């Protein structure tokens, strides 16, 4: 477990493919999706928070701090990341989206061990980059704030500009599958053998 890293679950998106429903709160076997992500992250970091712009009371039932975007326009994962960097009391922050419940149990460890001297690192499955699963140093906050103020929204471009290191989790493509639709959620529930309470 990494005490020097705060873990932030990104749950602030619009969830257009879920019909605008708050993706992190979709129930799978009677448990909200974000709780599966939370239980995966909990052994990896000592401090956690949730980045959310809607239904904050429901996310607050987790007992974790809820962090709102500092920008009012739903400007994508980067806005949640900026809020997370400003919230954290630790120097480093790891981000995971609320819809990737199988992300590697070694995610934080590998990003931390392999970042080298970089101020940021993000996951790749060997074929595709997964920039929302990323480790960032809080000193990147001013640069990110400026980037968003210019109207920029592309996460990958920001990470490249920050000199982020890509960390490969080879052969773990399935670990990075995100649940975009209700059908995805149902399929995942069946794969895991989860039954409705």
UniProtKB/Swiss-Prot annotation:
Domain of life of the source: Bacteria
Cofactor(s) listed: Mg(2+)
Cellular compartments annotated: Cytoplasm
This protein's record includes keyword Mitochondrion: no
Biological process terms in GO annotation: bis(molybdopterin guanine dinucleotide)molybdenum biosynthetic process
CDD domains named among the record's database cross-references: MobA
Coarse class of the protein's main subcellular location: cytoplasm
Protein's recorded name: Molybdenum cofactor guanylyltransferase
Provenance organism: Serratia proteamaculans (strain 568)
Lineage: Bacteria, Pseudomonadati, Pseudomonadota, Gammaproteobacteria, Enterobacterales
